């Protein structure tokens, strides 16, 4: 094997015709013979290029509605033959097989077919067979064959050939082969995962996951860690699918925090009014509803002004000028919203480093999707926590029942608590958080942290007393003892929402009654680690 290998003969068979004509013209200009199939051949011919049909090469027509067209020794022999192996060369000569030096294939759009909600039979028909077979053959023989599966690599191929007088280097072919194997792996993963869904398999014996590189990051959580951002091909609105209008490149921590922020604010449907969430280290500093988006932002910001500095702001409605004007008053890393007015965009333009992401929608907080966490030697796979409760799900367990206004705050606090790292305690007053206790090892400590945050809010805003006085309290899991509940009551809590289910529920309910609290059980836990 020599490092440089010439490209004399190419087979092109693509479903995505983007850039096809330009590629074909460039190859033809270098004297490369073009082979093709079906619609690809027609497109090339319509552009005035000379193309030889694969059916002419194999001596067999395309058959069975196109299911069989390239599955033939004349094709696979041309892809797999080792050019420096005498036996292979002799077999090629004996059977009239000509080498194929370049394969350009992109696969039937199976993923897109599934995404648009096609029926079972239509999805099956969009599973490519010949394409992956050729890709794997060409990739295995990358010592001599180039395989291109991505339109984004067309320019790189032509540049490589231009730099090497119509040849390509071994290192270049290796990189193409790696990309090709990753593509067929991702394709097979999409098919197998779709079939698992069709069969309603909760835990398939084997499961594959795949991603496409979106961004190479400067570093990971810390500067000594390498990192990259991959997308899974879904169209869920969020940081992976957003348009970045301005600002510096997103960092690993920006992406992680922005995802947490937008998933939280999506709990609040825009038709029910404006909502804002401000996030630091994937935990909410403040979350609020408002009569206007500007009011929602101000209330969320007021919850923890200190922590909001350098935070991520997520909005459930398009950013307007009034809200934009408030946001730029302090340092903010990222703002993510479904849209933005021209006036708001102009205001942000004065802050060149502020990242503005627009999504054209909100993620569905009830859409069932898969969540993963890597552990040493394996992956933990579970359904994303899309659990929700409404008024009819709540069970009043104390002598005192919450008022209508308290019920609204309790449900708001419950939605926020779902997105706080456990142990989570959230204090809410009038549709806004006033204290968030996150990530403590005991529920008592989380209640203490939330109370301290509320007291600091009072100091920062010059309030006569803690805003936690008369607040609604949410706990992401049951109170194992009454101490955490009583700490929340001492901070000013007037009503409580929690899952229930502790062996000491009776003791906790008794303590709530004695403290004059109203308490409801949800029957659902929201641990978040």
UniProtKB/Swiss-Prot annotation:
Catalytic activity, reaction form: (6R)-10-formyltetrahydrofolate + 5-amino-1-(5-phospho-beta-D-ribosyl)imidazole-4-carboxamide = 5-formamido-1-(5-phospho-D-ribosyl)imidazole-4-carboxamide + (6S)-5,6,7,8-tetrahydrofolate; IMP + H2O = 5-formamido-1-(5-phospho-D-ribosyl)imidazole-4-carboxamide
Entries under PROSITE patterns matching the protein: MGS (PS51855)
GO CC entries: cytosol
Residue intervals of the MGS-like domain: 2-149
Protein family per UniProt: Belongs to the PurH family.
Gene Ontology BP annotations: 'de novo' IMP biosynthetic process
Gene3D superfamilies named in the record: 3.40.140.20, Methylglyoxal synthase-like domain
UniProt xrefs under InterPro entries: AICAR_Tfase_dup_dom_sf, Cytidine_deaminase-like, MGS-like_dom, MGS-like_dom_sf, PurH-like
Pathway in which this enzyme or protein is active: Purine metabolism; IMP biosynthesis via de novo pathway; 5-formamido-1-(5-phospho-D-ribosyl)imidazole-4-carboxamide from 5-amino-1-(5-phospho-D-ribosyl)imidazole-4-carboxamide (10-formyl THF route): step 1/1; Purine metabolism; IMP biosynthesis via de novo pathway; IMP from 5-formamido-1-(5-phospho-D-ribosyl)imidazole-4-carboxamide: step 1/1
Protein name: Bifunctional purine biosynthesis protein PurH
Pfam families (alphabetical): AICARFT_IMPCHas, MGS
Keyword S-adenosyl-L-methionine: no
Written domain comment of the UniProt record: The IMP cyclohydrolase activity resides in the N-terminal region.
Domain of life: Bacteria
Gene Ontology terms, MF aspect: IMP cyclohydrolase activity; phosphoribosylaminoimidazolecarboxamide formyltransferase activity
SMART domains: AICARFT_IMPCHas (SM00798), MGS (SM00851)
EC code(s) of this entry: 2.1.2.3, 3.5.4.10
SUPFAM superfamilies, per the entry: Cytidine deaminase-like (SSF53927), Methylglyoxal synthase-like (SSF52335)
Alphabetic keyword roster: Hydrolase, Multifunctional enzyme, Purine biosynthesis, Transferase
Keyword Hydrolase: yes
PANTHER family attached to this UniProt entry: BIFUNCTIONAL PURINE BIOSYNTHESIS PROTEIN ATIC, BIFUNCTIONAL PURINE BIOSYNTHESIS PROTEIN PURH
Upper taxonomic lineage: Bacteria, Pseudomonadati, Pseudomonadota, Alphaproteobacteria, Rhodobacterales
